[in-house]
Each structure stands twice: as C-alpha cells, then as structure tokens.
Design a protein with these regions (language model features):
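Structured, helix-rich domain cores that form ligand/interaction pockets
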Residues: 1-207
Length: 208
C-alpha cells in the first residue's frame, strides 16, 4: 500500500485469485483492489509482487487523495519507479479519457458513427461496432467502438451526459453536454504511455 499512500488497516482483506496469476488474497477499499500474497513458485520463491486494479471511481478517489497532497498520477508512477526499479513493474491496462463539455460538442457520437460507416478513419484495426440503448421516449444513448477491446489500442466514443443522467436520475439540462472519448491501452502501449506521462504530466492537464 506504499504506492497508494494508504494505511493497510482500512482495507477489507479476503481470499481471492486471478486467472493465470498466483495471488491468493485481495485487499479492497471501495473500487480499489490490490491482489497479493502470491504463492511461492520456482520463478518467485519469496512470493513477492502485487496486482493493483482501480475502476473509474477508484481512480477518482486516488486522484482526490493525490491532489490533496499536491501530487499527480505522474508522481505516483515516479514513486513506482523509485521503489521497484524501472524493470520490476508494468502496466497491463490504462484507460485515457478526453472529455468534451462544450455546449456545442466538437463532434457527436452520431457523427463518429457516420465516419466509421464511410470508413473515414485510420486505425490499427478496421473493426468497429456500435451500441445503442434507450435513453427516453425520443432519444437513445450511443457508443462507438473502434478496434477490439483486447487489442493494444482501442477507442470508445459515447454520450457521457446520458450515462450520468441514467445513473444519477438527472436531466440533460442539469448535466449539460458531455461527450467522452476513451483510449484503452494494454500492456506495452499502456506502460509506454504511463512512463511518458510520468515525465510529461502536462499532457493530461487539459483533462484535469
């Protein structure tokens, strides 16, 4: 818990495993999960290591804690490097969000959908698909996906305003226009971005 800067005794601890991993226990507080107590193996005779997972809410919680200390996620990544060394930790997934809260959005999800249908985009994968769900009697909430979710880089574009309305029983007037672009990075791409952000935190300042 040194990286998070949180005391161990505030976590709930229970037995849990992860597929293809040797962890035997999980520490949880809210939407922050740390798997550890690795089973000793020939490759890991001391049973060292842990696996940190934070959902979107978990990231929001850690952001507030870091911000209260005048720190950023970049500082947290630097702490990882100082504590474990450059080659002894890695990111398996990192989701980057870009929010457009302009009254007139830079683009709508419907416009992105039409671009995909006309194949007016460049990506490592030609795959794309759409999801649409009922929002009210006259409208739907839309999501566009480009590339497979398991690929090294994939994109999601969706109506964040309608998602917030549905989750928190608010109106669009209360929430305001809010379109979100998410880049989902995995493995080498996730780690490379985190290390770039560590050294150049200004690349995320507009979002913050």
């Amino acid at each position: 818990m040194h990286i998070l800067g949180l005391p161990t005794d505030i976590f709930n601890v229970y037995p849990a495993s992860i597929k293809y991993k040797t962890y035997q226990a999980r520490w949880q507080i809210g939407d922050i999960y740390v798997s550890g107590d690795a089973r000793k193996t020939e490759d890991n005779p001391q049973g060292l290591g842990c696996y940190l997972v934070m959902t979107g809410r978990g990231c929001d919680d850690i952001f507030r804690i870091l911000d209260s200390r005048n720190c950023t996620f970049g500082d947290m990544f630097k702490h990882c490097e100082r504590r474990y060394g450059q080659d002894n930790f890695h990111f398996t997934r990192l989701d980057i969000a870009i929010d457009d809260k302009n009254e007139k959005p830079f683009f709508t999800i419907e416009q992105i959908k039409k671009k995909c249908e006309k194949e007016e985009f460049i990506s490592n994968s030609e795959g794309y698909h759409f999801d649409e769900s009922k929002f009210d009697d006259f409208d739907t909430a839309k999501t566009v996906y480009i590339s497979a979710g398991k690929s090294g880089l994939s994109y999601r574009f969706y109506d964040k305003d309608k998602e917030v309305c549905s989750k928190h029983n608010k109106t669009l007037d209360e929430v305001g226009s809010w379109k979100r672009t998410e880049m989902q990075l995995r493995d080498d791409k996730a780690h490379a971005f985190a290390m770039t952000f560590k050294d150049r935190p200004q690349i995320g300042r507009a979002h913050v």
